[in-house]
A protein has these predicted regions:
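Extracytoplasmic metal-acquisition and chelation regions
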Residues: 1-310
Length: 310
């Protein structure tokens, strides 16, 4: 938490980091609390910012533009996590390190939120065929179904209310606003995909299972559930065969992963190579430009409609 001092005008100014409970005992009448909220990658960061608004300080442990499958916390990160009030992570196998870290931390004052817990998880169809670095057989990319995104925002809202009950109405109002946006996004996807005659997507890695499941599409991943899985010759041949068989005209790559393999397959099959963003991370440039979960998901929908209409 941060200590805030009041000046004569009643304005609050951030002064320094302190351990919240100690400071609360002595200065309760002089400060307003701003909960510190740590999360693991862009989507969790975005959801926490939306629900927490100006009542929380949200810190994304994963640097902008970093592929989160590869990331692990540093000693400095662990120290900062122990000082926080809430730690948000996706779960479902996305963060391979999280169980060990939570066991090692002094978590008596830390509320941890596994945002995907309770969602019906899809299985990795290739779990027994490929040696993925993901040691889970579950697909963790739940947020690419807008209804799952709404569910995760609700989990975050409940955690914030638990820690900061005084601002319950504020968090409830923010959740209501963004839950409505999730429903509207879901409607856009249903309407946008319902009349498509083609249903097959070739994607950089198998991150789009929940999106495909929600809207009757099919994905063929060049790589597995982890974006850094390298396709072997057999997988490359299967992808090329699939693309030709289904007359796929667009091979999708991602923002945070080299497009080299996708472009190679596109050249081999006479297709275009374009971006489809799984929202595991965004570049600083896009964040500064105001991009968020909803804007990127709408861009994804436009890309899918174009690809499946060719």
């Amino acid at each position: 938490m941060r200590k805030k001092d009041l000046d004569d005008s009643g304005m609050h100014h951030i002064h320094e980091f302190l351990h919240g409970r100690m400071y609360w005992q002595y200065k309760q009448e002089e400060i307003e609390w701003q909960d510190k909220d740590y999360n693991k990658f862009y989507t969790m960061y975005d959801f926490a910012k939306k629900i927490g608004g100006d009542k929380v300080e949200v810190i994304n442990l994963v640097p902008a533009g970093t592929e989160p499958h590869d990331w692990e916390p540093s000693t400095k990160d662990l120290i900062e996590m122990e000082k926080s009030d809430i730690f948000i992570y996706n779960g479902a196998g996305m963060e391979q390190w999280v169980d060990d870290v939570l066991e090692s931390l002094d978590t008596e004052e830390l509320t941890s939120v596994e945002a995907s817990k309770g969602i019906k998880l899809l299985k990795d169809q290739d779990a027994h065929e490929h040696d993925h670095e993901h040691n889970s057989e579950n697909d963790p990319h739940v947020w690419l179904d807008p209804q799952n995104a709404k569910y995760e925002m609700n989990k975050i809202k409940k955690a914030l209310i638990k820690v900061d009950a005084e601002n319950k109405d504020y968090y409830e109002a923010n959740y209501k606003r963004y839950a409505k946006e999730c429903d509207e996004l879901d409607t856009l996807y249903k309407e946008g995909t319902s009349k498509l005659t083609k249903k097959e997507l070739v994607v950089a890695h198998e991150a789009f299972g929940y999106l495909c499941h929600a809207y009757g599409l099919e994905q063929m991943g060049i790589e597995g559930l982890s974006a850094d899985d390298e396709p072997d010759p057999k997988q490359m041949s299967e992808v090329i065969r699939f693309a030709k068989e289904h007359q796929v005209k667009t091979i999708f790559f991602e923002e945070l992963v080299s497009p080299k393999v996708a472009k190679t397959i596109a050249k081999e099959t006479g297709a275009n190579a374009k971006m489809l963003n799984p929202l595991e991370g965004l570049s600083n440039k896009k964040i500064k430009a105001g991009e968020d979960y909803f804007s990127v998901m709408k861009q994804n929908l436009a890309a899918i409609k174009e690809a499946l209409s060719e």
